[in-house]
Amino acid sequence: MNFLPLLGSATLIKGTPRVGHGVIRMDQGNAIKKDVQEFYDNLGWDKSDAGFSDASIYEDLRPVAADYIHRCHQRVKQHLPDSGRYLLDVASGPVQYDEYIAYSAGHERRVCADISLRALVEARKRLGDKGLYVVADVANLPFADDTFDGVVSLHTIYHVPAAEQEKAFNEIHRVLAPERSAVVVYSWGARSPLMLLALMPFLTWSWLSRRLRARADSLGRSDSPTLYGHHYGHGWFAGRKWPFAYNLYTWRSVSPDFTKIYANPRLFGRSLLSVLFRMENAWPRFFGRFGQYPMIVVRKNPPA
């Protein structure tokens, strides 16, 4: 199987790329990037009847939440170009949800870039020849400026080393074609005011659990890999001097922990999430600012 990016397309890959084909620059955040790579190669993209391990660990896969999550996934496509030559999927994983496939329906090719080779093998099974597959570091994308008609990055940048997250946003903007848009789904993590308010008692227990797991790790008793994440808050993002224009909307205002606790299938769980979805649509900027998962729509201005 060939994973070299876009063979025969000299305009897409830089003549002297900063990242070679299939090579990850590990000069910054070396251990973190290696840990993320190993997590997904060894565990995250294990597959079972329930789906991939990544979703089983980090998502609420219960039927009561399915319609809400499905409609949240569909929000991304509203802000992507309907058509074009290349759509870049940054940290594509295996393109695990059907809604994800729809994002590139009107594009000739979907370029999947991921730090995990195993992710790209699985993505190839999903997309076939529609896809082009590149092992790459999101903070050092090996593509020419102004290349892609659209870019999507879902739950990626908060797994990038904290010191490189600003660069990762800038890399997405750099490779985006002028007058086009990119969609980045981020997470404020524990800095989401709404989730702090709703989950405070449970967050205390979670903090204690993490301390116990960290102690077990230090004693060499950890029996499973963990995934790095660093979540900046809205203040950090709003305080950067970005070279791009952007709008901030909600992708989803609540975390899987929230839905698992409050969306009880026997106590109007579906109705609760349906009302929440309508509220998010009515006030997308409010919930993007204060909820769990902002959807950051980056736009690239035409050349001056």
Per-region residue spans from a language model:
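A conserved beta-strand element that flanks and buttresses the S-adenosyl-L-methionine
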Residues: 152
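Conserved class I S-adenosyl-L-methionine
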Residues: 20-81, 96, 100, 183-210
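Class I SAM-dependent methyltransferase SAM/SAH-binding core
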Residues: 88, 93-140
